[in-house]
Swiss-Prot record:
HAMAP family linked: LrgA
NCBIfam families, A to Z: PRK04125.1
Domain of life: Bacteria
Assigned keywords, A-Z: Cell membrane, Cytolysis, Membrane, Transmembrane, Transmembrane helix
A single cellular component GO annotation: plasma membrane
Family: Belongs to the CidA/LrgA family. LrgA subfamily.
Species whose genome carries this gene: Staphylococcus epidermidis (strain ATCC 12228 / FDA PCI 1200)
GO biological process: cytolysis; killing of cells of another organism; programmed cell death
InterPro entries in UniProt: Antiholin-like_LrgA, LrgA/CidA
UniProt entry tagged with the keyword Endoplasmic reticulum: no
Pfam family, any one: LrgA
Name used for this protein in its record: Antiholin-like protein LrgA
Length: 152
């Protein structure tokens, strides 16, 4: 009996060590860099133009969902990048300022374009969330109430 308990404790420690395995910042950055490299390769073969960063986000999401990449392998670097996102957008802001003469040619059209694209994004997001709710990916209260009386 004591041997079984000790074996169980050793197995639990091994599982805990795997869960708490720490990855260095270099390893985490390398993981993200490899995903971005793969997304750049995919981008070069795609018939429609799509940014490699968007492809990389989708690849990272799929890798996290399937368990190919563990959250611990990208969490610290991902959090650091998210915390400094404002600083990372500075080059984009500078390029907009450099393009100011082009933007001055039709400011009303640009403002109208921003408003329309924002509304389209909101509408698409709303329809997508409604689709997810109706397709039972997120169970509604009615289904939970129907199944709750079965067990008891």
């Amino acid at each position: 009996m004591v041997i079984l308990e000790q074996t169980h404790l050793v197995k639990n420690k091994a599982v805990d060590n795997k869960k708490s395995m720490k990855y260095s910042i270099f390893q985490q950055a390398l993981t993200i860099a490899v995903i971005l490299l793969i997304s750049k390769i995919i981008e070069s073969f795609m018939p429609i133009p799509m940014p490699a960063s968007v492809i990389g986000l989708v690849l990272l999401f799929i890798a996290l969902c399937t368990g190919i990449v563990k959250l611990g392998q990208v969490e610290t670097v991902g959090t650091a990048l998210t915390n400094n996102i404002g600083f990372l957008f500075v080059p984009a802001g500078i390029s907009v300022i450099n393009s100011l003469p082009i933007l001055k040619q039709s400011p009303i059209l640009i403002i109208l374009l921003i408003i329309i694209s924002t509304l389209l994004l909101l509408i698409c997001t709303g329809f997508s969330s409604q689709l997810l709710v109706t397709k039972s990916l997120f169970p509604s209260k009615e289904k939970n109430e129907e199944t709750s009386h079965i067990g008891g």
